[in-house]
């Protein structure tokens, strides 16, 4: 494994992509279960959630699976919770939250993202909670994604009280060097070992 010499986003992105892809299927499945234990500790009971935006994991980059999170939210936290999924536009670098309908199918794009074909677009202001993909996060709740800024742009349009949750197989680093004013931090991040709470920072 290469040595990490700096903590800027570009180097972190390259390093943690390789590190995460080195995980075996068995390791990932085990950690998915452990992350779910921590996810359940997030104080979202009684919040009156109506709509969530949840990413569909990219298998070849070893993103944390979200199926159990969806099941937990819809069955134990808020029966009938609307779960929307991202649909990206690589020309405008914008992203919409799409609520699938009965006839909605999901296809893999040329960027290897699984996205809904059709469905109902949900206004950013109607979203109560967002599960964000990430490669690495730091002890202040900042995250490094894939570099296009899709989620930060969407979050900027959401209500200030939207709940921002990350899922990570790996623990945080001390600090991401090149955080900007456009980077929107997490409220919580669930890892296999613990739940990180950034709401009081």
Regions found by a protein language model. Name each.
Residues 107, 125, 144-148:
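Short, amphipathic alpha-helical segments
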Residues 92, 130-134:
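A short beta-strand-loop-alpha-helix capping motif that often carries His-Thr
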Residues 67-71, 146-151:
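Charged helix-capping and loop-helix junction motifs
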Residues 37-40, 148, 189:
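Structured catalytic/translocation cores of nucleotide/phosphate-coupled proteins
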Residues 57-60, 135-139:
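Short glycine-rich anion-binding loops that position phosphate/pyrophosphate groups of nucleotides
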Residues 2-110, 114-122:
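N-terminal active-site beta-alpha-beta segment that forms phosphate/nucleotide-binding
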Residues 56, 87, 99, 115, ...:
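Short, structured patches in soluble enzyme cores that scaffold and shape functional sites
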Residues 1-9, 18-25, 80, 120, ...:
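Surface-exposed, charge/polar-rich loops and edge strands
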């Amino acid at each position: 494994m290469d040595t990490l010499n700096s903590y800027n986003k570009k180097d972190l992105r390259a390093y943690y992509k390789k590190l995460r892809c080195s995980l075996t299927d068995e390791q990932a499945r085990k950690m998915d279960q452990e992350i779910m234990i921590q996810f359940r500790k997030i104080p979202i009971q009684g919040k009156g959630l109506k709509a969530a935006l949840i990413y569909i994991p990219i298998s070849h980059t070893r993103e944390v699976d979200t199926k159990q999170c969806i099941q937990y939210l819809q069955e134990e936290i808020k029966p009938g919770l609307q779960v929307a999924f991202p649909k990206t536009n690589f020309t405008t670098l914008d992203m919409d939250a799409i609520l699938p309908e009965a006839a909605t199918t999901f296809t893999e794009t040329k960027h290897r993202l699984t996205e809904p074909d059709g469905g109902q677009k949900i206004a950013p202001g109607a979203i109560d909670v967002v599960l964000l993909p990430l490669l690495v996060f730091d002890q202040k709740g900042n995250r490094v994604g894939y570099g296009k800024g899709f989620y930060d742009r969407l979050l900027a349009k959401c209500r200030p009280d939207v709940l921002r949750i990350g899922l990570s197989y790996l623990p945080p680093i001390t600090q991401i060097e090149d955080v900007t004013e456009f980077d929107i931090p997490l409220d919580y991040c669930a890892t296999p070992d613990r739940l990180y709470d950034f709401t009081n920072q």
